[in-house]
């Protein structure tokens, strides 16, 4: 028979787990690939002439044993969180990417000829007692480069949730751009429809464990640039301390993707682009806001930005004179001030505008990608339960 103190302890532990509700993943902010190149005095276009952009998944062949994906902006993001794989735990820094659905990390079997593998944490299946081989070949392509690997199964722990997960061990990882990346791999937070090789995505496996109070996850990026703490991802809900007001929800516009209808893009409250509507995706895997080349060209010309070595730039002294740029989603308008969408690197007099051009052909495009530049201003809730995305103003 339980003693009274044992009963109280048992109930307390149960309540601790069942207020489950929120499982938190701390995000660290580090220099993006773009910023790393900038610090070295290089531009993206200098080292990646054929790699201006990527876009995720092809609609055909996703469930074949060997399938491919095209990466957008080569995961040029600043925000990474930690997960573990295997028993005992092997730790990896990953990008939580709403634009894809697979988990991949470098493999211990990756040849030392690939310097990008050597410079990152690598998964060693021989060190894990819970590893199970699968072997299915996986290829992820971007521009003229590629990542090659094979599927394995092991225990993956995200926040405090352990799941049995198929993931890709990358054995061919190109030096450019991954040599400049501060993350080890990518954890896709997209829908199963986007998954390469028919793999069940990590978040779907977490949902099947029924440990979350709601089948949602939220993404918060801190606005405080001086802090190394980049924000957090919350599984199972959202944290009111990260936002003000209420969430406003927009239903996803395409089954199986985090796409929403974009009713217009305006400059100083005047609709300038997407008069007849466009499609946008909220992309946690990229830093900039991207759109069709013709639209971005008009937008940049309107604010006086010019193209220089692959990036749009403007005189830093003009930042305070630039107009707000707004995105119309659902019944709401989400505005970005110039201090948000213009980036200043070190002591340069020329500043980078955080917009880039990307032409995605039909049927997947044309498409706007709202990356970290947008997410820093607005706390985002991705709701799998109701197939919708919520937006609230971040603190």
From Swiss-Prot:
Domain Peptidase A1 intervals: 79-392
GO molecular function: aspartic-type endopeptidase activity
Disulfide bonds: 110-117, 274-278, 316-351
Alphabetized CDD domains for the sequence: renin_like
UniProt EC number: 3.4.23.15
Active-site residues, record numbering mapped to chain: 97, 283
One of the Pfam families matching this protein, by short name: Asp
InterPro entries: Aspartic_peptidase_A1, Aspartic_peptidase_AS, Aspartic_peptidase_N, PEPTIDASE_A1, Peptidase_aspartic_dom_sf, Renin-like_dom
TM annotation in the entry: none
GO biological process: angiotensin maturation; negative regulation of renal sodium excretion; positive regulation of artery smooth muscle contraction; positive regulation of blood pressure; positive regulation of vasoconstriction; proteolysis
UniProt-annotated glycosylation sites, renumbered to this chain: 64
Tissue-specificity statement: Expressed by the venom gland (at protein level).
The organism's place on the tree of life at top rank: Eukaryota
Description of how activity is regulated: Inhibited completely by aspartyl protease inhibitor pepstatin A, but not by the serine- or metalloproteinase inhibitors PMSF or EDTA.
Family from the record: Belongs to the peptidase A1 family.
Name of the protein this chain belongs to: Renin
Organism: Echis ocellatus (Ocellated saw-scaled viper)
Lineage: Eukaryota, Metazoa, Chordata, Craniata, Vertebrata
């Amino acid at each position: 028979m339980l003693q009274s103190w044992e009963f109280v302890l048992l109930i307390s532990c149960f309540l601790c787990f069942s207020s489950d509700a929120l499982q938190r993943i701390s995000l660290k902010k580090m220099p993006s690939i773009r910023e790393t190149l900038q610090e070295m005095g290089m531009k993206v276009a200098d080292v990646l002439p054929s790699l201006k952009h990527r876009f995720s998944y092809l609609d055909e062949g996703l469930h074949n044993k060997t399938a491919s994906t095209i990466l957008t902006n080569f995961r040029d993001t600043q925000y990474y969180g930690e997960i573990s794989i295997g028993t005992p735990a092997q730790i990896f820094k990953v990008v939580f990417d709403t634009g894809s659905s697979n988990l991949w990390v470098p493999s211990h079997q990756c040849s030392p000829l690939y310097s990008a593998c050597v410079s990152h944490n690598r998964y060693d299946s021989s060190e894990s007692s819970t590893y199970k081989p699968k072997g299915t070949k996986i290829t992820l392509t971007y521009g003229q480069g590629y990542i090659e690997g094979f599927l394995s199964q092991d225990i993956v722990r995200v926040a405090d949730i352990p799941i049995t997960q198929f993931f890709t061990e990358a054995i061919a990882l190109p030096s450019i751009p991954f040599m400049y990346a501060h993350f080890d791999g990518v954890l896709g937070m997209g829908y199963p429809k986007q998954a390469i090789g028919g793999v069940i995505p990590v978040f779907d496996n977490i949902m099947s464990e029924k440990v979350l109070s709601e089948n949602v996850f939220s993404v918060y990026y801190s606005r405080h640039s001086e802090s190394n703490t980049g924000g957090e991802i919350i599984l199972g809900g959202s944290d009111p301390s990260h936002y003000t007001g209420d969430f406003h929800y927009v239903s996803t516009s395409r089954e199986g993707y985090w796409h929403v209808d974009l009713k217009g893009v305006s400059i100083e409250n005047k609709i300038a682009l997407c008069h007849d509507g466009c499609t946008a995706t909220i992309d946690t895997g990229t830093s900039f806001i991207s759109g069709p080349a013709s639209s971005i060209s008009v937008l940049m010309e309107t604010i006086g930005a010019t193209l220089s070595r692959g990036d749009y730039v403007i005189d830093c002294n003009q930042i305070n004179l630039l107009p707000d740029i707004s995105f119309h989603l659902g019944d709401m308008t989400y505005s970005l001030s110039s201090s948000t969408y213009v980036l200043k690197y070190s002591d340069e007099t020329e500043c980078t505008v955080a917009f880039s051009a990307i032409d995605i052909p039909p049927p997947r495009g044309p498409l706007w990608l709202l990356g970290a530049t947008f997410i820093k201003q607005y706390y985002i809730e991705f709701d799998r339960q109701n197939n919708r995305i919520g937006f609230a103003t971040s603190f």
